[in-house]
């Protein structure tokens, strides 16, 4: 029985998941888990990329110890961040995190040189101040001159493992430098940030085989034979592949540190209406586009948990929230002030004071403020999707860690008036593995793969509670409009 390993690294944790097809069902087991996070070093918030690679090898050693002698392996991580690699093939610095404050005003600065309309028409990508385009705009110019290759995080990890450099297209699209239809980097945008297309390795599709690990690794670690496949390396792209896609007019919500809500298209949408709403057209696997909005996710809850000294689990925090009435205050969860505050609890409380609302004090009140306002924001985005697509989204497929938060899922279903199918929580790893299986010929296509997912995992169904909170979405929309002036 073939074994497939997903290296799935998010902003707060990473894992190695092993998947196998057994009697038409995908069996998934976690082989290794580790923490992730940035640290302030050399004047910036940076990722410890060497630590992440070391943890991958620890996981592979565990897999070998478990009796697996040969595996396929794919790597996905968060998007937009990159590693600068010199001519000697070594990194020039530890990669800077997208949450670093260096790009806080970069959109305004860069768009004095090139218009927003040009950028959006060319790339179709949502304006976010941490996109790779703006990070490179703020990058050390002398360091860029020494750079031979600019590698996205998962591409760099694949390069270290195999010695082969590529630029996988689903992640490349998140840079806001990739041409929407040609699938090539836009030279005008590259020039504005002092880089050239030669500084990126060859663009490849998901499902490209990189091959075996470098021999040096086998002398250093006790490893199985590993065949590396370039999957949909942006974790959201993998998560969408791993979404069951229940319903006729469906949308997805990849609910983790970030919330990514949208639908899957065969033809991108980058007209005036979607430009105004700041939607993105990220490339998906197999010729699709992920039409979505990138908004705040469980990052707020993760920060609160940490600030409470981890004395509560997420399930315990959800229980405490369930004892509190929802919608006691309205919060624009996408406000930039919540992106990387010194203290999330204090930031939420200050926001409520400044807007003249009830201030949440207890852990339960704070968590309910987060969950209920995330649900409101999701419902608001679904109403925008309805308008853009010209039909009512009737089903929302929630995957990722947030699919386990029943309270938030039920509120979302009721407020948005949609059926919610929650799960699987490990959709990213599943989508990663599914691309490997398609590449190997074990699964014919994504459609059949999604049917396997539906039959393999527990998917919870939530339906709207009729008559509850019927006016709250309109009130929240009025609040957002007033706040934005």
From Swiss-Prot:
Pathway: Carbohydrate degradation; L-rhamnose degradation; glycerone phosphate from L-rhamnose: step 2/3. CDD domains: ASKHA_NBD_FGGY_RhaB-like (cd07771). Its cofactor is Mg(2+). The keyword DNA repair does not apply. Gene3D superfamilies: 3.30.420.40. Keywords: ATP-binding, Kinase, Magnesium, Nucleotide-binding, Plasmid, Rhamnose metabolism, Transferase. InterPro entries: ATPase_NBD (IPR043129), FGGY_C (IPR018485), FGGY_Carb_Kinase (IPR050406), FGGY_N (IPR018484), Rhamnulokinase (IPR013449). Its EC number is 2.7.1.5. It catalyses: L-rhamnulose + ATP = L-rhamnulose 1-phosphate + ADP + H(+). One of its GO terms (molecular function) is rhamnulokinase activity. It holds the Pfam family FGGY_N. One of its GO terms (biological process) is rhamnose catabolic process. Involved in the catabolism of L-rhamnose (6-deoxy-L-mannose). Catalyzes the transfer of the gamma-phosphate group from ATP to the 1-hydroxyl group of L-rhamnulose to yield L-rhamnulose 1-phosphate. This is Rhamnulokinase. It comes from Ligilactobacillus salivarius (strain UCC118) (Lactobacillus salivarius). The gene is rhaB.
């Amino acid at each position: 029985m073939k074994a497939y390993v997903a290296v799935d690294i998010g902003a707060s944790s990473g894992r190695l998941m092993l998947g196998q097809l057994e009697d038409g069902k995908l069996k998934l087991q976690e082989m290794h888990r580790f923490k992730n996070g940035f640290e302030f070093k050399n004047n910036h918030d940076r990722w410890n990329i060497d630590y992440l690679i070391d943890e991958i090898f620890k996981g592979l050693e565990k897999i070998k110890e478990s009796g697996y002698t040969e595996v396929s392996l794919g790597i996905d991580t968060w998007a937009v961040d990159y590693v600068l690699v010199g001519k000697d093939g070594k990194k020039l610095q530890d990669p800077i995190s997208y949450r670093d404050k260096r790009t806080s005003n970069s959109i305004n600065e860069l768009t004095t040189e090139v218009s927003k309309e040009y950028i959006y028409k060319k790339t179709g990508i949502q304006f976010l101040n941490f996109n790779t385009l703006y990070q490179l705009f703020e990058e050390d110019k002398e360091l860029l001159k020494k750079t031979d290759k600019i590698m996205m995080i998962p591409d760099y990890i694949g390069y270290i493992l195999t010695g082969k450099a590529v630029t996988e297209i689903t992640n490349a699209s998140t840079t806001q430098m990739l041409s929407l239809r040609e699938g090539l980097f836009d030279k005008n945008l590259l020039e504005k940030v002092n880089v050239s297309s030669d500084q990126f390795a060859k663009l490849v599709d998901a499902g490209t085989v990189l091959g075996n690990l470098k021999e040096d690794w086998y002398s250093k670690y006790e490893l199985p034979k590993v065949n590396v496949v370039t999957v949909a390396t942006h974790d959201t792209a993998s998560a969408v592949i791993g979404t069951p896609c229940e319903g006729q007019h469906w949308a997805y919500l990849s609910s983790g540190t970030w919330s990514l809500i949208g639908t899957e298209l065969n033809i991108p949408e980058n007209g005036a209406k979607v430009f105004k709403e700041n939607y993105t057209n990220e490339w998906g696997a197999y010729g699709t586009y992920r039409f979505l909005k990138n908004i705040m996710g469980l990052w707020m809850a993760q920060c609160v948990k940490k600030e409470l000294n981890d004395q509560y689990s997420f399930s315990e925090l959800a229980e405490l929230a369930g004892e509190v009435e929802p919608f006691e205050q309205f919060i624009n969860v996408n406000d930039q002030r919540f992106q990387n505050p010194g203290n999330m609890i204090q930031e939420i409380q200050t926001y409520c004071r400044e807007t003249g609302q009830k201030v949440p004090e207890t852990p339960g009140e704070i968590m309910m403020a987060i969950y209920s306002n995330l649900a409101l924001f999701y419902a608001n985005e679904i109403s925008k999707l309805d308008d853009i697509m010209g039909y009512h989204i009737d089903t929302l497929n929630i995957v990722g860690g947030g699919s386990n938060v029943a309270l938030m899922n039920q509120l979302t279903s009721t407020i948005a008036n949609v059926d919610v199918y929650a799960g699987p929580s490990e959709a990213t790893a599943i989508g990663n593995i599914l691309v490997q299986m398609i590449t190997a010929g074990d699964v014919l296509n994504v459609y059949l793969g999604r049917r396997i997912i539906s039959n393999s995992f527990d998917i919870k169904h939530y339906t709207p509670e009729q008559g509850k909170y019927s006016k709250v979405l309109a009130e929240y929309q009025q609040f957002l409009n007033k706040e934005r002036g």
